[in-house]
C-alpha cells in the first residue's frame, strides 16, 4: 500500500470573536505552522439580525443596513488585528468577511477559497447552546467539502503561555 499524503496548506478558521474563537484561532495557527500553510480567518455577520435593522430603518430611525454592516466589519477587523493577528507566530493570515446565514457562508467560503481544512468551535456567542453557532457547526460538518476540525471551549484546551 502506498503512502497517502494530504495537503493542508489552506486552513480556514471560523471566528465570531467569542471565547471559543481564541482556541479555534490557536489551533488553526498550530496546524498551519506544522504544515507550512496559511490561515484564512472567516467572520460572518448573521443576516438574521439584519432584519431588525432594516425594520428600524424603514420606520424612520435613520439606520441604514449597509452602513451598519460596514461599521460591524470595521469593528471586527480592528479586534482581529489587535487580539488575534499579533499571536500568529509568523503564519501568514488573511481575514475575510461574509454576510448571510453563517453555515451557508462558511460552506461558500470553503469552496471559493479552496480550503483544505476548516477549524471551528462547537459553540459561539451567547448561551443559546445549539441555537446559533452550535447548529452552524452541525450543518458545516454535514455539508463541508473539506475535513472539519471541531474545537472545544477554552476550558478544554491547553494554550501556550
PLM segments and residue spans:
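Short, well-ordered secondary-structure micro-motifs
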Residues: 24, 51-54, 107-108, 131-132, ...
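Short, flexible loop segments at boundaries between secondary-structure elements
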Residues: 146-154
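Structural beta-alpha unit
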Residues: 1-6, 34, 85-118, 155-161
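Glycine-rich, Arg-bearing micro-motifs that act as flexible, cationic patches
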Residues: 117-139, 153, 157-160
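Short, hinge-like loop/turn segments at secondary-structure boundaries
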Residues: 56-60, 112-113, 136-137
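Small/aliphatic-rich secondary-structure junction motif
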Residues: 2-61, 156
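General small-molecule cofactor/ligand-binding pocket signal
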Residues: 42, 94-98, 149
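A short acidic, glycine-rich active-site loop
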Residues: 61-78
Amino acid at each position: 500500500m502506498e503512502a497517502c499524503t494530504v495537503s493542508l496548506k489552506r486552513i480556514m478558521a471560523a471566528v465570531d470573536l467569542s471565547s471559543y474563537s481564541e482556541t479555534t484561532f490557536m489551533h488553526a495557527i498550530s496546524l498551519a505552522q506544522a504544515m507550512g500553510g496559511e490561515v484564512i480567518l472567516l467572520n460572518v455577520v448573521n443576516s438574521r439580525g439584519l432584519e431588525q435593522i432594516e425594520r428600524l430603518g424603514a420606520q424612520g430611525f435613520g439606520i441604514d443596513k449597509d452602513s451598519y454592516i460596514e461599521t460591524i466589519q470595521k469593528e471586527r477587523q480592528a479586534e482581529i488585528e489587535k487580539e488575534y493577528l499579533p499571536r500568529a507566530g509568523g503564519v501568514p493570515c488573511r481575514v475575510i468577511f461574509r454576510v448571510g446565514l453563517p453555515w451557508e457562508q462558511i460552506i461558500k467560503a470553503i469552496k471559493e477559497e479552496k480550503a483544505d481544512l476548516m477549524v471551528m468551535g462547537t459553540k459561539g456567542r451567547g448561551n443559546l447552546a445549539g441555537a446559533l453557532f452550535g447548529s452552524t457547526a452541525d450543518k458545516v460538518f454535514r455539508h463541508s467539502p473539506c475535513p472539519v476540525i471541531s474545537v472545544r471551549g477554552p476550558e478544554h484546551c491547553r494554550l501556550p503561555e
